[in-house]
């Protein structure tokens, strides 16, 4: 069953991580949301759809720039970081007020790309 559809992702109701992310988004305090989002961002085996949803929810529901940056950097450093999550981040860089935060995200994405193993031909 599809619960949300947009140009970036289709979120499926039976993905427990997406349901968990939605529950976290309803927490009252920013610090609580940050800690819970960060636990998910570091989780192994996080689906592509859940990663994209996490990016959207963290950027929409965290007030502090440092908290947003912390979640995205944690996800980028996750070995399972997906290209769809990367695209979602890049499309939403305007959610950051400070150029230094935008540059930090871009820098870490670039470092990840340069360290990624190349395919054997």
Give the positions of each predicted feature.
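Non-catalytic all-alpha helical scaffold/repeat segments
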Residues: 1-121
């Amino acid at each position: 069953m599809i619960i949300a559809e947009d140009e970036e992702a289709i979120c499926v109701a039976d993905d427990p991580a997406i349901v968990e992310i939605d529950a976290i988004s309803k927490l009252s305090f920013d610090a609580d949301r940050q800690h819970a989002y960060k636990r998910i961002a570091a989780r192994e085996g996080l689906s592509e759809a859940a990663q994209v949803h996490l990016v959207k929810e963290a950027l929409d529901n965290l007030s502090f720039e440092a908290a947003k940056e912390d979640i995205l950097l944690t996800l980028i450093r996750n070995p399972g970081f997906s290209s769809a999550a990367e695209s979602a981040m890049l499309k939403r860089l305007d959610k950051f007020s400070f150029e230094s935060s935008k540059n930090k995200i871009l820098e870490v994405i670039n470092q990840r790309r340069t360290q990624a193993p190349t395919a054997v031909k």
